[in-house]
C-alpha cells in the first residue's frame, strides 16, 4: 500500500471540500468556500496546539524562555510546511506521484539544514533532557511505544538486542521529527522497524513467528508494531 504524504494544508483543504460536497448532497445551502486565509487560521491553530502540548512537558518556569521556545517550534513547523510544498511542487512538475518513496531522497536533503538549525536553537535554551522531550512529543512517543512492543512480542531478547532496538528507534526519531505529517513519520519509523526485524532475524530470533504468535493471542488488540 502506498503512503500518500500530503501536507497538513492539503489535508485541511480536502476536508473543506468534503464538507462542501456533503452540504450540497444534503440539499442544505452551500457553505462559503474556505479561503486561503481561512485555511491559514486552521493550520496555525493546529500547530499552536501541538506546540502547547510540547511546552507542557518542558515545565519551563521563565515566561520569556517559554515564549522563545514556543516561537522556535512554531517556526520549525512552518519551515517544514514550506519544504513540503516545495518538494510536492517539484514532484508534480516532474510528473511523479506524491508518495513517501518519491519524496524520501528530497526529504532527507532538504531537511538536513532545517534539522540542524532547529536543534541548535533549542540547545541554546533547553537542556539535553528537555530536547529529548521535544523530540519525543514531535514523534508521538513512538520510540518508547515501539521499544516496549518489541520487548513484549519477541521472546528471549538479550541486552545487546534491546540496545540495538533502542539505537535504531532513536535514529528513526531523529529523522521523523522532520516528517511533515503523521503518516510520513510512521513511514520513517517503519523503515527502521524493518531494519530491526532484519537484525533480530540475523541474531537468532524469528520475528515473523513472534509477530504471528502475538497476533494470534491478541487478535483484536492491535498492539503489535507493523512488520
Name every feature range the model reports, one short phrase each.
Residues 25-227:
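Charge-rich (acidic/polar
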